[in-house]
C-alpha cells in the first residue's frame, strides 16, 4: 500500500501550554490534543452462525499526525521537510519531537457510527488533509490481531463515491500488536498513536520506524507536498482483502520472507520507493485477482453484476489444505452478496488461467501469461502468506490517491505504453490520463468510502443468501443448514479430496468426494467433503 501523508502546521489559534511528556532518546508523545479513539464494533462468529459483538476502536496512523518539538509548538516536520535543528539525525529527532493526539472528524474526516467507518478524501480545517489510514484496536494501547487461516472475513462497503484514481483499501498487515513498543523501548507512542506500520512495499515514507525518526537521507517528494522518502523502510507481509473504487477492484496476497515487521535500508528495501523494485525481502506485486484484468469486463462497476452504485457485502475465505487453522493456506476464495443474492467471484476467461480464486497454480499461470515476474513464488507464495495469517495481522482501513502511478495499475491500462489487448494490461475503464493526485484532489474532494458490518468466523459462518439489506441495514447472519448428500451428485467431473469444496452456488468443480467422505452442505454457497 501507498499512502498520502499529512503535516499538521502550527495551530492558528493560541493554545494553553500543556506539559509534554518527553525524556531520553525516545520517540515522544504530546498532550496538547487528547487522543480519544473512535469506537467501532465488529462481530466474531461461530460455526453455528451465532455472532458476538466486539467493542473495538480505530486509531489513525502516526504518519498523519502533527509532529512538534517537545515542550512547545515548533514543527519538527513542515510540508515534506524536517527541521534541521530539531532533527539532525534519527535518534536526536526522536528525542526532540512528539506525536500529537488527533481530532478524527474535523482534522481527518474520519467518523464512526456503530459498526461503520466513513473516510472522507479531503478534509479542510486549519490545514488540508488528504486521505487517511486507520487500524482496528482491541483496546486503547493494542491493535486487534486477526488470525484468518480456515476462516472467512466479511464486510460491507460503499464505493459509490470513489471515482477513478482513488483507492478505498481494506487490508491486513503483520504489524506488532503494540505498535512496536516492547521491541523498541524508544517508541513511547505505540499503538495508541498508530505507530508500527509496515507492508509489502517496505514503505520508506514513514516518519518514524522502530522508535527512531527516518530523517537521515530524507528526500522530499517532487509531486507530493506532504511526503518524502528516508533511508529506512518498514517491511511485513500484506493481505489486500480489498483495493477498489467504483470502477475496479482487486484482492491480492503479498508474502514476505519474514512475515512480521522488520526494518530495511535503502534500495535493498525494494518496492515502490526503491530503484530496485524486486530487491527486497517482500513481494511488492503480489498475486492479484482483478475481474476486469482476468477478462470479465461486465462483472464489477456501476450497473454491473456487482453494482457499485449501492452497498454490497464482500466475503473472503482462507481455505487450508486440511480444513484446520493449523493447516497450510491453499486457496483464497471470494464471494459477494447484494440485494439478497450471493454472487460468486467471476471466472478468469484467459486460456490457461482458469478459476475464480487465488491458488499457487493460478498465480503461476497468471504470471506466465501476463509476463510478470513471479516474485510471489520467490517469497513463499500461498504458504508464505499463510504464515503471516497464522501469526495474526492488523486490520487496516484506508483511502488514498497514488503519487507513484496514478492508480492506473488498479483501474486503467498499465503499463500505459502497452496495448490494451495485451493480456494483463487492461485493469479497468478509467482513462490513462486519469488519477493524477492534483486533479483528483481538486475535482473530487468530497469523495468518500464507508466500511461496515465486519464479521470474522469459520468458513460459512458470517453470511448467507439473505445478504445485505439494500435499505441500509446490516448483513444478516443465519445459522447455516448442514445436510449430507451422497457421492456422485451431478456437477463437475473428478473427485474432491477431504476438506475440498464439492458444491455451492456457481460451483463448477467436482461434486463427488473421495471415500469415505461425503459432501456436506454448509450453506447455499459452500459444500465441503467431510
Swiss-Prot record:
Region Disordered, residue ranges: 462-492
Q: Low complexity composition bias: which ranges?
A: 475-488
> A single GO molecular function, which one?
cellulose 1,4-beta-cellobiosidase activity
Q: Which InterPro entries match?
A: CBD_sf, Cellulose-bd_dom_fun, ConA-like_dom_sf, Glyco_hydro_7, Glyco_hydro_7_sf
Has keyword Transferase?
no
Note the Pfam families from the entry: CBM_1, Glyco_hydro_7
> What top-tier enzyme class does this entry carry?
hydrolase
Q: Which region ranges are annotated with the description Catalytic?
A: 27-461
**Which SUPFAM superfamilies does the annotation name?**
Cellulose-binding domain, Concanavalin A-like lectins/glucanases
Disulfide bonding pattern of the chain: 502-519, 513-529
Compartments annotated for it: namely: Secreted
Q: What sequence ranges are listed for the domain CBM1?
A: 494-530
Record has Glycoprotein as a keyword? yes
| EC number, as in UniProt | 3.2.1.91
**What is annotated as the active site?**
238 (nucleophile), 243 (proton donor)
Q: Where is it chiefly localized?
A: secreted
Domain of life where this protein originates: Eukaryota
Residues of this chain annotated as glycosylated in UniProt: 296
Ordered alphabetically, the record's keywords are: Carbohydrate metabolism, Cellulose degradation, Disulfide bond, Glycoprotein, Glycosidase, Hydrolase, Polysaccharide degradation, Secreted, Signal
- Where in the sequence is the signal peptide annotated? 1-26
Reaction catalysed by this enzyme: Hydrolysis of (1->4)-beta-D-glucosidic linkages in cellulose and cellotetraose, releasing cellobiose from the non-reducing ends of the chains
A biological process (GO) of this protein is: cellulose catabolic process
Q: Record's GO cellular component, any one?
A: extracellular region
Residues of the region (Ser/Thr-rich linker) are 462-494
Family classification: Belongs to the glycosyl hydrolase 7 (cellulase C) family.
Can you name this protein? Probable 1,4-beta-D-glucan cellobiohydrolase B
State the organism named in the record: Neosartorya fischeri (strain ATCC 1020 / DSM 3700 / CBS 544.65 / FGSC A1164 / JCM 1740 / NRRL 181 / WB 181)
Amino acid at each position: 500500500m501507498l499512502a498520502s501523508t499529512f503535516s499538521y502546521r502550527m495551530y492558528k489559534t493560541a493554545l494553553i501550554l500543556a506539559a509534554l511528556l518527553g525524556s531520553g532518546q525516545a520517540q515522544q508523545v504530546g498532550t496538547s490534543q487528547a487522543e480519544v479513539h473512535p469506537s467501532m464494533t465488529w462481530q466474531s462468529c461461530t460455526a453455528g452462525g451465532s455472532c458476538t459483538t466486539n467493542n473495538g476502536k480505530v486509531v489513525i496512523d502516526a504518519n498523519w499526525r502533527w509532529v512538534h518539538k517537545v515542550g512547545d509548538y515548533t514543527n519538527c516536520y513542515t510540508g515534506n521537510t524536517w527541521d534541521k535543528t530539531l532533527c539532525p539525525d534519527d535518534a536526536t529527532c526522536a528525542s526532540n519531537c512528539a506525536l500529537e493526539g488527533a481530532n478524527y472528524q474535523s482534522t481527518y474526516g474520519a467518523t464512526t457510527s456503530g459498526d461503520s467507518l466513513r473516510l472522507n478524501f479531503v478534509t479542510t480545517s486549519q490545514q488540508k488533509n488528504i486521505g487517511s489510514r486507520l487500524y482496528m484496536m482491541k483496546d486503547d494501547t493494542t491493535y486487534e490481531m486477526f488470525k484468518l487461516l480456515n476462516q472467512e472475513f466479511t464486510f460491507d462497503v460503499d464505493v459509490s463515491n470513489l471515482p477513478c484514481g482513488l483507492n478505498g483499501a481494506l487490508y491486513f498487515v503483520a504489524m506488532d500488536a503494540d505498535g512496536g513498543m516492547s521491541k523498541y523501548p524508544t517508541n513511547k507512542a505505540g499503538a495508541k498513536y498508530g505507530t508500527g506500520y509496515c507492508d509489502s512495499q517496505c514503505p520508506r515514507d514513514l516518519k518514524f520506524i522502530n522508535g527512531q525518526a527516518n530523517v537521515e537521507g530524507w528526500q522530499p517528494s517532487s509531486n507530493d507536498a506532504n511526503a518524502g522518502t528516508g533511508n529506512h523502510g518498514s517491511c511485513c507481509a500484506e493481505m489486500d482483502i480489498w483495493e477498489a473504487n467504483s470502477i475496479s477492484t482487486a484482492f491480492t496476497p503479498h508474502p514476505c520472507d519474514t512475515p512480521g515487521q522488520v526494518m530495511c535500508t535503502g534500495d535493498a528495501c525494494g518496492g515502490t520507493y526503491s530503484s530496485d523494485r524486486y530487491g527486497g525481502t517482500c513481494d511488492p506485486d503480489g498475486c492479484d485477482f482483478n475481474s476486469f484484468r482476468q477478462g470479465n469486463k461486465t462483472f464489477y462497476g456501476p450497473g454491473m453484476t456487482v453494482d457499485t452504485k449501492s452497498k454490497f457485502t464482500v466475503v473472503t475465505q482462507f481455505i487450508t489444505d486440511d480444513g484446520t487453522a493449523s493447516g497450510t493456506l491453499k486457496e483464497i476464495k471470494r464471494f459477494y452478496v447484494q440485494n439478497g443474492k450471493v454472487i460468486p467471484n467471476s471466472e478468469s476467461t484467459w486460456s490457461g488461467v482458469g478459476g475464480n480464486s487465488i491458488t499457487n497454480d493460478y498465480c503461476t499461470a497468471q504470471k506466465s501469461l501476463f509476463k510478470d515476474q513471479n516474485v510471489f513464488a520467490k517469497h513463499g507464495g500461498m504458504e508464505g502468506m499463510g504464515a503471516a495469517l497464522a501469526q495474526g495481522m492488523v486490520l487496516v482501513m484506508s483511502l488514498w490517491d497514488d503519487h507513484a502511478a496514478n492508480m492506473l495499475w488498479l483501474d486503467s491500462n498499465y503499463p500505459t505504453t502497452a496495448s490494451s489487448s495485451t493480456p494483463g494490461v487492461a485493469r479497468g475503464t478509467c482513462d490513462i490520463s486519469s488519477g493524477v493526485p492534483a486533479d483528483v484532489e481538486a475535482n473530487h474532494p468530497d469523495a468518500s468510502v464507508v466500511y461496515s458490518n465486519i464479521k470474522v468466523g469459520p468458513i460459512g459462518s458470517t453470511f448467507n443468501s439473505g445478504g445485505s439489506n439494500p435499505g441500509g441495514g446490516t448483513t444478516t447472519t443465519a445459522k447455516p443448514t448442514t445436510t449430507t448428500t451422497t457421492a456422485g451428485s451431478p456437477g463437475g467431473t473428478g473427485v474432491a479430496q477431504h476438506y475440498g469444496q464439492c458444491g455451492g452456488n456457481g460451483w463448477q468443480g467436482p461434486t463427488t468426494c473421495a471415500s469415505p467422505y461425503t459432501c456436506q452442505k454448509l450453506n447455499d454457497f459452500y459444500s465441503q467433503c467431510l
